[in-house]
Amino acid sequence: MKLLKPALYCTPLPQEISTQLLMRACGSAHLALVDYNLYLSTYILYDKRMTSISLKTAEDIAGMRVAGRLGSEVLDYITPFVKAGTTTGEIDRLCHEYMLNVQGSIPAPLNYCPPGYTPYPKAICTSVNDVICHGIPGDKILKNGDVVNLDITVIKNGYHGDNSRMFLIGEPSILAKRLSEITYECMWLGISMVKPGNYLGDIGHIIQQHAEKSGYSVVREFCGHGIGTVFHEEPQVLHYGRPGTLTKLEAGMIFTIEPMINAGRREIREMGDGWTIKTKDRSLSAQWEHTVLVTETGYEVLTLSAGSPPPPAFITPA
C-alpha cells in the first residue's frame, strides 16, 4: 500500500495485554502511552514516514529475523483452521490470540490508520475470491472452492514481520489453483532478482512478464514496501515495470515483495468499508508475500518458518 504521509495508530489495549508486554512488543522508542484517566487503555504509535531508504544495521537485521519468523509462524499455526465452515472472523480471533498469548507480539494492522482511511478494525486481513487485498474479517463463512489470502504482520521488539499466503478451500477450481501457483511463482521470481546492483525495476519487470504471459494481470495501485521499525517505509516496490530502472539495490535494504495478480483485468474497485479492494470485473485475485533482506551476495527471505511452502523448483537458492 502506498503511504505518502505519517500514519497514526490509535488502538484500545485489550485487557489481556499488560503495559510491559506492549513495551516489549513495540519497543519503547516507538511507543507513547496516553492518559489512562482520559483515554482508558489507549496507546498511540506514530509510523514515522521516512523520506529516504534506510540500510538496516546488524541489530535491525537480527530483530527483523525474529519478527519475520514469528509472522510466518502465525500462518503455520492457523493453517489447520482455514477450512470450509470457518468464518474469517474466527480466523482473525485465533491469530490475534496466538500473537498475544503465545508469541508476545502484537498485530500491526489493528487500528492502523493512514491518512484518508478509517482505523483498520482487525488483527489480520482476509481476502476471499475477488478481494484483492485488505479484506476485513467478519461473519463470512468459508466454503468449498473458495480461495483466501491471509495477510499477517506482527510487531515484536519494535520490528515488523509481514507476510501472506494463499489458501485453497476444499476442492478448488483449476483456474483458482493455477492463479495461486502462478502468483507464487511471480513472488519468487521477483525475490530471485534481489541482489546488490540490481534495480527495483528488475523485480517488477520479471513479475509482470510472468503474470502476463500466463494470461493474468498485475494490480498497479498497491505495491510492496520497505519495512523495519516502521510498517511502511521507502522504497515502494512495484510489481510491474522496466528492467534497469528505479532504485538500485544495496545490501541492508529490507522490503516486501507481494504481487497481487488478477485472473481477469487489473482494474480495481474500492468497497464502502474504506479498506476492502476488489477486482472490478469480479474475477479471482491472488497474492503471496515475503519480507526480503538484500545481503552482500543476494537475498535472505526473513519470513520463513517450518511450515513455509518451499520455493518453486526453478528458483536457485540465494
Where do the PLM segments sit?
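Intrinsically disordered, low-complexity polyampholyte segments enriched for Lys and acidic residues
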Residues: 2-5, 16, 35-37, 47-48
